[in-house]
């Protein structure tokens, strides 16, 4: 019997968000493939995201999370477990607290300055 279903549901949603962030980051990042050749010993396959230093989270599961940073940290590579993945090792994390980035992207076509102001007002740096 679940005593506090709202707490249980919150934990489930946060676990799903963490998993989604982790999987999606790895889907988009490249990796190093070790090869044995006279010309090289390693090849980069895919995008090198190691120099990405800012991660922005948006969407209901992150906005409503009690700890959105924990989910967003899923984009970071673990140098021990994933030495060849081309993801950042550290980053600053922001939350689209008002869930308006999508609208600001559309607004940009009408007025760049207003769109930028909307985005800046919505982004909250996570500790």
Model regions: which residues?
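Helical "lid/coupling" subdomains associated with nucleotide-phosphate turnover
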Residues: 3-127
